[in-house]
Amino acid sequence: MLMMDTLYDWLIDGFTWLVIKLGIMWIESKIFVIQFFWEMSQKVIDMFTIYPLIQQAIDMLPPQYSGFLFFLGLDQALAIVLQALMTRFALRALNL
C-alpha cells in the first residue's frame, strides 16, 4: 500500500509540474506575440511618419490650446492609442 501511495504522489506531482510548465509556456508565448506585434506596429507608425502628423495637427490649433495639449501629452497619448489599435488589428487578423 505504501508503494502505491508513493507512486500516486509521484504521478500527481509530475502532472502538477507539467501543467504549471505548460501554463507558463502559454503565458510567455502570448507575451512574446503581443510584444512582437507592438514593435511591428511601432515600425509601421515610424514608416508612415504618423507621429509628426499628429504634432502638426495639434500645432494648427491656436497657441493656447496647442500648448495645453502638448503639456498634457495628448500627442503621445494619441500615438500610443493608435499603436494599440494597430496591434489589436494585427492580433485579430491572425486570430490570436
UniProtKB/Swiss-Prot annotation:
The keyword Endoplasmic reticulum does not apply. Coiled coil: none annotated. Keywords: Enterotoxin, Host cell membrane, Host membrane, Membrane, Secreted, Toxin, Transmembrane, Transmembrane helix, Virulence. It comes from Vibrio cholerae serotype O1 (strain ATCC 39315 / El Tor Inaba N16961). The lineage of its organism: Bacteria, Pseudomonadati, Pseudomonadota, Gammaproteobacteria, Vibrionales. The chain crosses the membrane at residues 76-96. Increases short-circuit current in rabbit ileal tissue mounted in Ussing chambers, by increasing the potential difference. Cultures of V.cholerae containing the cloned ace gene cause fluid secretion in ligated rabbit ileal loops. The keyword Membrane applies. One of its GO terms (cellular component) is membrane. This is Accessory cholera enterotoxin. InterPro entries: DUF2523. It is found in: Secreted; Host cell membrane. One of its GO terms (molecular function) is toxin activity.
